[in-house]
Amino acid sequence: SNKYRMRQGTLLAVSMLLFCIFLLSGCGKLPEGMLKQEKELYTQGQIRMIAATERNRYQNLYTGQLWSVTADGQGNTFESLLKSQIGQFLEELAVVDRMADEQGIQLTSQDEDDINNLAEEYLAYMQVSKDEVLDLYRKYYRADKTVSQMTESKNLEVSDAEAKVIQVERIETDSREKAEELLLQASEEKSDFTSIEEKNSLNSQIKFQLEWGPDLKEPDRSAFALEADEISDIIEKDGRFYIQKCVNAYDQQATALRKERLAQKKKTEAFQKIYLPYQEKYRVRLDGDVWENIDFSAGEGCNSDNFFSLYHSYFSK
């Protein structure tokens, strides 16, 4: 089926990957077309859904004591910073939802059926109305769909060469004479390169996973010229001498993951060029009162952290 999706991750990662926009700033006169602050933008139940998901995701990993901890140099607590991130996400979601209206991007009957099933499952975890869950998932899905449709004409392809990941083993020494001696040993028939490097390398790390990039420095750059099981010549860099052996000239799994990551980055950058001018015209602010009943230090009986993970289980590749 023709399904759209965002990359799985934290709320901040979702916000950055989908929108790549920092918290909207500035006060004073509202620009023409700007959405006014209003409590009705989201219900308290919808805000609790996102807040509970993020609160519990962190608390399930760490501890409930973290909310009062000072998290930056300005004296903000971890709770206040996370609320700011949640607010940013909800504001951006509202902007892209309005963009979808103007672009005529709507949900199909199949989309509605999928989202209805998703909402029914989520209701088992949260004490909110079905309408609140449906509305929030619709906004989230349509924002996802808007990003996909508005970037589908862009060149987002990433080549295997661009995403290439390799595995190497490396000997590092501070003497050319020593390096020449070790290269002779490593070049002998049936020599054990791993054993030689473990005994002689000055760096305790001997295995490296390298990602190709145009700005690679030595000795990383030379490693990409090696074939599988090939041993390099001596490479000198900043008074150190390196000998490398290519263990895997094309790490298929790691390359595929990186290719997906780079494609998502291109997609984010392409959408950002569309989103930023639009966001300047239609800004959104949540009313400050929406946080009055949201207390991260309370709610120990609720451990739901799956608003986003459940979404991705429905709308994945």
Segments (PLM) and residue ranges:
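Sec-exported extracytoplasmic/periplasmic mature domains
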Residues: 52-56, 87-106, 117-128, 138-156, ...
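Bacterial N-terminal signal peptides that target proteins for export
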Residues: 2-13
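Peptidyl-prolyl cis-trans isomerase
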Residues: 182-220, 248, 252
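Short linear loop/turn motifs
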Residues: 110-121, 202, 210-214, 292
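C-terminal motif of bacterial Sec signal peptides marking the signal peptidase cleavage site
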Residues: 23-26
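Extended intrinsically disordered, low-complexity coil regions enriched in Ser, Thr, Gly, Ala
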Residues: 107-111, 161-166, 171, 188, ...
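PPIase-associated folding chaperone regions across multiple families
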Residues: 37, 127-174, 178, 217-317
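N-terminal targeting/tethering segments
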Residues: 28-132
